[in-house]
């Protein structure tokens, strides 16, 4: 990783990304969210009946401190703990509260030292899968399966002024919502349908949220790999 081409899907053309803008309750908190995949950026750019833009950038990562959640030292629970920290969600049951608190206590990473974060993007459907796991409804294996259903792709998130200084705008493409919103919706619908089918399968030997709490499972537990 040195120089990367990144794309940002947006209803606007963004020639100069600005540090400090964006929602604090996105997956990894406030930041500038990009992807290395043009087609995904085009999907993210469009809403129903509204076209968008896929902004293209180059970033030089030399000298940046980048957290890659897909590296072997981290597990899906590290990613999930970050979602519990930053995303808004309704805690509807006592087990969900215990699960979210446990994840944040034992798996939450401090993003403060990092200039950028690489990790999964949690569309609404995938966030519902994560909630189901924290609520003890599905096993860790089923959650991992669910995350692969829609080919989420990774996002590259700029978090610090140092990262914003490294990104350079190249160009943009207009994205037709009749094409790309339809693709996004179809991918989401397919993932939800496959997940519903997975829910009908009992994973009797699986590792569930209550097991993790009861057994005090730690990040180095081989069952998390």
Task: Describe each region flagged by the PLM.
Residues 11-12, 38, 61-63:
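Short, flexible loop/turn elements at secondary-structure junctions
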Residues 23-48:
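Extended catalytic/binding region for NAD+/ADP-ribose chemistry, centered on the ART fold
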């Amino acid at each position: 990783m040195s120089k990367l081409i990144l794309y940002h899907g947006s209803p606007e053309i963004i020639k100069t990304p600005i540090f400090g803008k964006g929602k604090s309750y996105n997956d990894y908190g406030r930041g500038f969210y990009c992807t290395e995949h043009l087609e995904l950026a085009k999907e993210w750019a469009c809403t129903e009946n509204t076209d968008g833009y896929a902004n293209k950038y180059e970033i030089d990562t030399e000298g940046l401190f980048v957290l890659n959640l897909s590296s072997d030292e981290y597990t899906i629970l590290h990613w999930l703990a970050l979602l519990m920290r930053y995303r808004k969600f309704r805690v509807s049951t006592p087990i969900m509260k215990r699960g979210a608190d446990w994840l944040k206590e034992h798996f939450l990473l401090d993003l403060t030292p990092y200039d950028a974060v690489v990790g999964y993007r949690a569309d609404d459907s995938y966030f519902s899968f994560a909630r189901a796991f924290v609520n003890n409804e599905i096993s860790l294996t089923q959650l991992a399966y669910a995350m692969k259903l829609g080919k989420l792709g990774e996002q590259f998130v700029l978090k610090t002024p140092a990262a914003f200084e490294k990104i350079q705008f190249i160009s943009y493409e207009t994205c037709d919502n009749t094409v790309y919103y339809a693709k996004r919706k179809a991918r989401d619908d397919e993932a939800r349908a496959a997940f519903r089918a997975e829910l009908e399968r009992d994973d009797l030997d699986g590792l569930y949220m209550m097991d993790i709490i009861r057994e005090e499972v730690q990040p180095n537990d081989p069952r998390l790999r």
